[in-house]
């Protein structure tokens, strides 16, 4: 079904499940492992003897060679991307004061890997690799127990995951946020998930850092007459695979492309939107206003338009399919949705690093010192002024 009018807001209905999720969080906080075992039996239909996966080596040894080779190759690609984004130590000096920033990794990180019809090893790679490259010392992973297979185990072993927990849903987020007898309390939780996972991340965010609250998948395709309509259609279908609430928009200057897309996609069950524009500059204005998760620049000379993009989670240039970013290009597939790309980007090493600033007053300018004292006194902080003055008078 096609729609020409873009909705002003995107679907985000996790508020409906907040009361239930809050009950789950409270159960885990109050009763720890016992609550987790009961909740796993209730929601994941898993009667567990242990919340910790103890068969990682055994399972990892059973990975088929073709998947092992694929994981190894993708691992190298993702590591290379994230290594190129590591910050340099920043330092300088002015008015007799040395100053700078030290980058330090978060100590303990929890990763949620969702379950569904299949396991999602790509999400484990996308979340754990930037954490390891950033220098995180302890990484703990939670995923539904029926989704721990040889591929997940192989990645966990390769990335030296400290523990793999057999827990799904809101109860997994609660366990990572507050800790239990078996589950380590972490400093930050990252990873995608369903409406219950997102609601739980929202609720625990007052107690533990999170990467963000993510909604359904989003794709904006900007295309001109040079775009291969078959590839455009495939990209739109690919993102629609994430579910019926996927938010998919074609913004184009081409009537031919509109006709071809409609001819194919009007048969589909998912909803999509088309915006006809007069120029690619106008299309970019539309995309910047939407601030999508994925943005595809399917135009002639796409790099020449990059400087005009202000809001997007990840950008696919030319023939590059967004699906390649989802798996192996290098950038992360854990991306902001629901217009959050206005203020933040996809998962990077910076999500696992914190800047610590320092100053060393070697021979500070006397006038600067006196001005600091003056402002301290103006604000009513007399001992701030005295503390400064005692050093330099």
Swiss-Prot record:
Binding-site list for Zn(2+): 239, 242, 326, 384
Gene3D superfamilies: 1.20.5.1300, Nitrogenase molybdenum iron protein domain (3.40.50.1980)
Residues forming the catalytic site: 293-294
Amino acids binding NAD(+): 112, 171, 194
Enzyme Commission number, as recorded: 1.1.1.23
Keywords annotated in UniProt: Amino-acid biosynthesis, Histidine biosynthesis, Metal-binding, NAD, Oxidoreductase, Zinc
Entry keyword annotation includes Nucleotide-binding: no
Pathway stated in the Swiss-Prot or TrEMBL entry: Amino-acid biosynthesis; L-histidine biosynthesis; L-histidine from 5-phospho-alpha-D-ribose 1-diphosphate: step 9/9
Co-factor note (free text): Binds 1 zinc ion per subunit.
Gene Ontology biological process: L-histidine biosynthetic process
Domain of life where this protein originates: Archaea
Binding site for substrate: 217, 239, 242, 294, 326, 379, 384
Record's protein name: Histidinol dehydrogenase
Lineage: Archaea, Thermoproteota, Thermoprotei, Sulfolobales, Sulfolobaceae
């Amino acid at each position: 079904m096609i729609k020409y009018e873009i909705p002003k807001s995107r679907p985000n209905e996790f508020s409906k499940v907040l009361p239930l999720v809050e009950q789950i969080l409270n159960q885990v906080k109050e009763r720890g492992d016992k609550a987790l075992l009961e909740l796993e039996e209730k929601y994941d239909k898993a009667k567990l003897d242990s919340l910790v996966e103890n068969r990682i080596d055994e399972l990892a040894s059973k990975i088929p060679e073709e998947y092992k080779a694929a994981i190894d190759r993708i691992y190298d690609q993702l590591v290379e991307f994230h290594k190129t984004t590591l910050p340099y130590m920043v330092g300088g000096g002015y008015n007799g004061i040395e100053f700078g920033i030290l980058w330090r990794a978060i100590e303990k990180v929890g990763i949620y890997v969702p379950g569904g019809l299949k396991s999602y090893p790509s999400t484990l790679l996308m979340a754990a690799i930037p954490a390891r490259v950033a220098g995180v010392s302890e990484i703990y992973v939670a995923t539904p127990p029926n989704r721990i297979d040889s591929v997940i185990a192989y990645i966990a072993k390769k990335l030296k995951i400290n523990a793999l927990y057999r827990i799904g849903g809101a109860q997994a987020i609660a366990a990572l946020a507050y800790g239990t007898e078996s589950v380590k309390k972490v400093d930050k939780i990252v990873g995608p998930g369903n409406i219950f996972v997102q609601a739980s991340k929202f609720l625990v965010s007052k107690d533990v850092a999170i990467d963000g609250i993510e909604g359904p998948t989003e794709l904006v395709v900007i295309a001109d007459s040079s775009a291969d309509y078959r590839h455009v259609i495939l990209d739109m279908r690919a993102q629609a695979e994430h579910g019926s609430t996927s938010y998919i928009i074609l913004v184009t200057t081409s009537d031919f492309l509109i006709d071809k897309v409609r001819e194919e996609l009007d048969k589909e069950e998912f909803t999509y939107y088309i915006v006809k524009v007069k120029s690619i500059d106008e299309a970019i204005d539309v995309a910047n206003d939407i601030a999508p998760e994925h943005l595809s620049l399917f135009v002639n000379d796409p790099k020449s338009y990059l400087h005009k993009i202000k809001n997007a989670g990840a950008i696919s240039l030319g023939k590059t399919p967004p699906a390649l970013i989802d798996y192996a290009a290098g950038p992360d597939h854990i991306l902001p949705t629901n217009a959050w790309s206005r203020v933040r980007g996809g998962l990077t090493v910076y999500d696992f690093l914190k800047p610590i600033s320092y100053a060393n007053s070697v021979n500070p300018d006397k006038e600067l010192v006196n001005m600091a004292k003056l402002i301290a006194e103006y604000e009513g902080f007399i001992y701030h002024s005295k503390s400064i003055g005692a050093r330099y008078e």
